């Protein structure tokens, strides 16, 4: 008598024979985990079994959240258990909210902190870069710009309103020579130029300031051992307005890959 052949079938075929369709979703809770088993059709129109595992944890939530979870469900979820139902509930996207205080809000609206805006401005061509990186540095455009600044600064010094304060005679242009003779030298029209390169020479210093106004004396500080420039120099102009123009033009001016710092020379106390 021939043996009976055993016909093996897949679980999907068995489910189809037993239920004639998709079986209901089942949930089981074991050892702090919840297992949700559901059935659905894939893209090839075949039944598939999907098992999702959730870890159950307890957390402290605000009273409003706890109260909202006690609301009675309605519609297709009327008979659902507490919690979301994957058949009727779908999370589209997660929205993260960030609350800023007043200081952070002001900082966010500060135009100086905007990385898209360039705060650098060239003194030569008014471009959005530093003067030391200007492609027109040392050209005729740079020379014309320095001459215009010198003229404007000199005119501003002449037209400056008088404050009404007492001015000593040795500070006035009319008797400046008398004051210089009494003190040995006149520092009222002297400026100090710092942040110079080591390769600076007297010829370079004269070339830097000669277009601003006539000078009476120049001093370039050098190291006694190496003979290199110490990084600063003094220039005495014949007129105080020329010294003021030099400060206006050269302070912050890029020279030899360095930014110059120019200020009034402090008088020595003898």
From Swiss-Prot:
Disulfide bonds: none annotated. The keyword Cytoplasm applies. InterPro entries: eIF3_g, eIF3g_N, eIF3G_RRM, Nucleotide-bd_a/b_plait_sf, RBD_domain_sf, RRM_dom. One of its GO terms (molecular function) is RNA binding. It is found in: Cytoplasm. SMART domains: RRM. HAMAP family: eIF3g. Component of the eukaryotic translation initiation factor 3 (eIF-3) complex. The eIF-3 complex interacts with pix. This is Eukaryotic translation initiation factor 3 subunit G-1. The lineage of its organism: Eukaryota, Metazoa, Ecdysozoa, Arthropoda, Hexapoda. The gene is eIF3g1.
């Amino acid at each position: 008598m021939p043996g009976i052949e055993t016909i093996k079938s897949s679980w999907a075929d068995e489910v189809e024979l037993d239920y004639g369709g998709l079986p209901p979703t089942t949930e089981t809770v074991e050892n702090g985990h919840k297992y949700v088993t559901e059935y659905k059709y894939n893209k090839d129109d075949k039944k598939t079994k999907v098992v999702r595992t959730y870890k159950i944890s307890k957390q402290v939530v605000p009273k409003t959240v706890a109260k909202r979870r006690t609301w009675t469900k309605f519609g297709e979820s009327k008979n659902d258990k507490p919690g979301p139902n994957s058949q009727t509930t779908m999370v589209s996207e997660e929205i993260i909210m960030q609350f800023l205080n007043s200081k952070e809000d002001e900082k966010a609206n500060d135009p100086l902190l905007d990385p898209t805006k360039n705060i650098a401005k060239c003194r030569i061509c008014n471009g959005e870069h530093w003067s030391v990186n200007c492609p027109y540095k040392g050209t005729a455009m740079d020379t014309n710009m320095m001459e215009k600044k010198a003229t404007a600064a000199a005119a501003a010094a002449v037209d400056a309103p008088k404050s009404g304060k007492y001015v000593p005679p040795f500070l006035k242009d009319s008797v400046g020579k008398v004051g210089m003779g009494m003190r040995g030298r006149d520092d009222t029209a002297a400026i100090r130029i710092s942040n110079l390169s080591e390769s600076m020479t007297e010829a370079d210093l004269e070339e830097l300031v000669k277009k601003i106004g006539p000078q009476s004396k120049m001093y370039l500080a050098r190291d006694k051992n190496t003979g290199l420039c110490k990084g600063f120099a003094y220039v005495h102009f014949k007129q105080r307005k020329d010294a003021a123009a030099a400060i206006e033009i050269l302070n912050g001016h890029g020279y030899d890959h360095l930014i110059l710092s120019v200020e009034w020379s402090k008088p020595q106390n003898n």
